[in-house]
């Protein structure tokens, strides 16, 4: 645990000093991510928004409040079950979508986070997260709710909470997607427990 935290903190120190793209000169602060560094589930968003840039934490605005409600309904908490991060670690001006260049520059940091935390499940929030994590052939409207492989891990694309705020009709199918995440999480947990039981 100590080595993992040390490795994650070393990466955080590196990210906090990053000036590799123009967002370094417009951000207030870097939003590295937060949660359990040993989490089985990692939530990957697009980029920090205005509220996140002010508070220095991921998903604290209206979208984040809705995300927390959904996760709590699943029985998940940020501190125990999850680690939350973004494709891009700095707030794009005017809350715009990150450019391809910005995402490509920042992606190695996210991939290193995933390598260190080693989650079993990735929840990909929205079209940008799906595109940058899984590739251009995927579409959020077509592929949400389906398990897809991402870097040897199970990934579940879901609508971004901001989309649910704009279109409440998306809430029901999104809840179905999260229920599938809960089902898979429990399945993986039981598999681990069974292996431990049989080995004793």
Annotated model-derived regions:
Residues 1-200:
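A polyanion-binding, active-site-adjacent surface
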């Amino acid at each position: 645990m100590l080595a993992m935290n040390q490795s994650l903190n070393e990466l955080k120190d590196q990210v906090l000093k990053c000036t590799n793209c123009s967002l370094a000169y417009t951000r207030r602060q870097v939003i590295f991510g937060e949660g359990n560094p040993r989490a089985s589930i990692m939530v990957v968003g697009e980029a920090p928004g205005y509220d996140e840039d002010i508070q220095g934490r991921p998903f604290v605005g209206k979208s984040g409040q809705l995300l927390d409600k959904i996760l709590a309904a699943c029985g998940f908490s940020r501190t125990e079950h999850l680690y939350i991060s973004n494709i891009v670690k700095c707030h794009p001006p005017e809350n715009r979508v990150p450019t391809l260049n910005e995402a490509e520059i920042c992606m190695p940091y996210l991939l290193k986070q995933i390598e260190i935390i080693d989650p079993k499940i990735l929840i990909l929030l929205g079209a940008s997260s799906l595109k940058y994590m899984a590739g251009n052939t995927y579409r959020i409207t077509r592929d949400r709710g389906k398990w897809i492989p991402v870097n040897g891990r199970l990934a579940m694309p879901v609508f971004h909470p901001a989309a649910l705020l704009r279109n409440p009709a998306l809430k029901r199918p999104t809840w179905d997607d999260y229920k599938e995440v809960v089902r898979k999480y429990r399945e993986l947990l039981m598999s681990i427990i069974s292996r431990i039981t049989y080995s004793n």
